[in-house]
């Protein structure tokens, strides 16, 4: 009987510890910081998992969707990446980072014309230039140079 009480006590203790662990509220700020730390180390799979949780907790944050799309793109999940960039841009159509990264996705999937559309939108948003505009220009030019070299 004494052994049974000990086993029961241990079971209850560990059950409450496990429940407390899984019952803990997810802090979106903490998730975002964790994801960006993974991105800084180019740990795209880890960042992707964290950003999945983040976007569930903050579904109206265009930056979360943009980073989630970015990790999908880096993992070569182009359809998911495209869908997530679209979500980010639906929330904030003038999100320069989403426009740049979506343009890079278009380049990577051989849709230079669509990348040019994003470039033109960035030109409207940044009449005197901005980092996103310059980065997308470079990305498109680099791809066009690579195509020319392959043809020669």
Identify the residue ranges that each predicted region occupies:
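Canonical tetratricopeptide repeat
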Residues: 67, 101, 135-139
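Helix-start (N-cap) detector for alpha-helical repeat units in TPR-like alpha-solenoids
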Residues: 27-28, 62-63, 96-97, 129-130
């Amino acid at each position: 009987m004494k052994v049974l009480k000990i086993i029961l006590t241990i079971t209850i203790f560990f059950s409450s510890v496990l429940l407390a662990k899984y019952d803990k509220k997810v802090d979106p700020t903490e998730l975002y910081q964790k994801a960006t730390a993974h991105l800084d180390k180019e740990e795209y799979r880890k960042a992707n998992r964290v950003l999945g949780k983040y976007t569930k907790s903050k579904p109206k944050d265009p930056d979360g969707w943009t980073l989630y799309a970015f990790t999908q793109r880096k993992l070569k999940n182009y359809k998911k990446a495209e869908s997530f960039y679209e979500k980010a841009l639906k929330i904030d159509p003038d999100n320069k980072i989403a426009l740049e990264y979506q343009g890079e996705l278009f380049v990577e999937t051989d849709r230079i014309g669509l990348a040019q559309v994003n470039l033109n939108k960035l030109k409207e948003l940044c009449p005197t230039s901005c980092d996103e505009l310059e980065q997308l220009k470079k990305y498109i030019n680099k791809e066009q140079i690579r195509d020319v070299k392959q043809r020669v």
